[in-house]
Amino acid sequence: MISAELIELATQFLKDRTKQTIYLDKEILAYRWSGGRHGSLLPIDVNLSLTLDDLHGIDGQKAQLIQNTRQFLQGLPANHVLMTGSRGAGKSSLIRGLLAKFYSQGLRVIEVARDDLYHLDKIRQVVKNTNNNCHYIVFCDDLAFNVEDENYRTLKSILDGALDSEQERLL
């Protein structure tokens, strides 16, 4: 007879080694990558009460982001965006404001920590294989690295694109 401990170990071994299918539900507005190499996208509860109109002193940046997001949602060329500024400058608030404004048009957000950037290709594949007509902005707060950093090379590779890259629904 097999012990419960051995069954538990075998179950954990298989769970760690099997490729888990990741689904994106169109009803979920935001996800966060969690779990490292064997991770998945976990739903985030997002407060949509903050709107772009609540953000003051950054009207030029808001206008550019709104235009870029509209183009992205319409399937037109859109640019990757790198927002810089000190802590509390409103970068995360801009993303929440964009989500509040455009979620009804299919905009969704995927948050990725800097140390998980090497999973961007996996996330790109998930979006590519998802049939829900949503458009996903990948948001990474607190980007800081040097040219030798593996995360930098990964991000640059994804941003530069590949022949099979899913740029129509992932920004």
Predicted regions and their residues:
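Interdomain "pre-motor" coupling segment immediately N-terminal to P-loop NTPase/helicase cores
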Residues: 1-43
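Conserved catalytic/switch belt of AAA+ P-loop NTPases
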Residues: 128-129, 146-171
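Catalytic acidic motif of RecA-like/P-loop NTPases
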Residues: 56, 141-145, 160
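AAA+/P-loop NTPase substrate/partner-engagement loops
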Residues: 101-148
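Dynamic helix-loop-helix/coil hinge segments at AAA+ ATPase domain boundaries and subdomain interfaces
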Residues: 40-64
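Pre-Walker A adenine-sensing motif
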Residues: 60-74
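Walker A/P-loop nucleotide-binding motif
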Residues: 75-97
